[in-house]
Amino acid sequence: MSRRSTAEKKTAKSDPIYHNRLVNMVVNRILKNGKKSLAYRILYRAIKNIQQKTEKNPLSVLRQAIRRVTPNVTVKARRVGGSTYRVPTEIRSTQGKVLAIRWLLGASRKRLGRNMKFKLSHELMDAARGNGNAIRKKEETHRMAEANRAFAHFR
């Protein structure tokens, strides 16, 4: 048994404009090469674009998109007796949120469009409506977990 005390969980900081932790989580995933101001600019312009297009609260659209994409289960590779099984495991809400943000940004990067602002805003609006590549990724993960339910006892 370890003698060290358990590390305290870091609380996520909130962003300067909306004072929202979720926005900060998305910004930190957009971030490339330490250019945080650029990441903030991309997300804030995408949020402004969502507000112009939908005339709804853009943060509620962001929240709904992340909620729709968040998976309940995922599959992990587990090696048993020389063969590898994809074992379905439940995931916590924070890990699910992280996966959802990662999938949303990955889907928006693959999208065709002018720039990241438009691609991200359209992907978020699609996910909030219930379609888009990020939603497809979640459904694919759930299908994989359902197909490998027989291996759930290997957890």
UniProtKB/Swiss-Prot annotation:
Cellular localisation: Plastid, Chloroplast
Gene3D superfamilies hit by this protein: Ribosomal protein S7 domain
Broad class of where this protein is predominantly found: plastid
GO molecular function: rRNA binding; structural constituent of ribosome
Record GO biological process: translation
Keyword Plastid: yes
Function: One of the primary rRNA binding proteins, it binds directly to 16S rRNA where it nucleates assembly of the head domain of the 30S subunit.
Protein name, entry field: Small ribosomal subunit protein uS7c
Origin organism lineage: Eukaryota, Viridiplantae, Streptophyta, Embryophyta, Tracheophyta
